[in-house]
Amino acid sequence: MDLKILRDKQEVGAAAANHAAQSLRRILARRDWARLIAATGASQFEFLKALTSAPGIDWHRVELFHLDEYVGLPITHAASFRKYLLERLIRKTGITRHHLLDGERDSGEVIREVGGELRSDTVNLAFVGIGENGHLAFNDPPADFETEEAYLVVELDEACRRQQVNEGWYSSLAEVPTRAISMSIQQILKAEEIIAVVPDARKAAAVKACLEGEISANAPASILRRHPNTTIYLDRESAALLSQAVSRSI
């Protein structure tokens, strides 16, 4: 695992986007299609803005999947991850081959359909974040590290739901859905390359737990340390609690 610490979230977004753009160009040079998983949330704003402006990427040859979606949330809601990806990635790039998780449909049917498409070929690149509770996608602690299902329905813990309020997606905890469809941990780890974009001081405790603590279901994103080709981008604030030894050696 490679660790990059930049000055602020703007530098994180620019550096991670440059890395992602280079990876996509390399993939498209050797394959007809690049198969991509994208993350959502406030931590991805600067990254996706920079990436969608990067030159030399044939986005019409990119097949897109995403990590998670709330069960029962309409696409018109500001917090809908389908809405997020349509506005911040798909429409800006012209991606036409995308598989969005429809939280308004029967979850079992969505999981079968999108999971089947996801597993039909190798995923080349995955963009992820780390939650304030250490979650990876919506796999809150204690996460299921064993299931081989592509997606699963999960119960969202209170820390995760409060994060959504604090980021401004909802005005109260009562408004935040309690269940979501989430890509599984094992499915995320099947990606050939993972780029994690994790700025902000509010992520510092989770970053420390995931990078310095035991690899544990209680710190779900700690599992990224077992992936052979992962790069984590932090800013000074999200890296603030790391020991110097860790920040130098990872």
Where are the regions a protein language model picked out?
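N-terminal glycine-/serine-/threonine-rich phosphate-binding loop
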Residues: 1-36
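Glycine-rich beta-strand-to-loop/alpha-helix junction loops that act as flexible
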Residues: 38-43, 128-132, 199
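ATP/nucleoside-binding phosphotransfer catalytic cores, i.e., glycine-rich phosphate-binding loops
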Residues: 183-186, 190-250
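Class I SAM-dependent methyltransferase SAM-binding "motif I" and its flanking Rossmann-like core
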Residues: 137-183
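Glycine-rich phosphate-binding loop
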Residues: 121-146
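Glycine-rich N-terminal segment of FAD-binding domains in flavoprotein oxidoreductases
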Residues: 25-55
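A glycine- and small-aliphatic-rich helix-loop capping segment at beta-alpha/alpha-beta transitions
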Residues: 49-59, 141-150
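Ligand-binding beta-strand-loop-alpha-helix segment within the catalytic cores
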Residues: 58-127
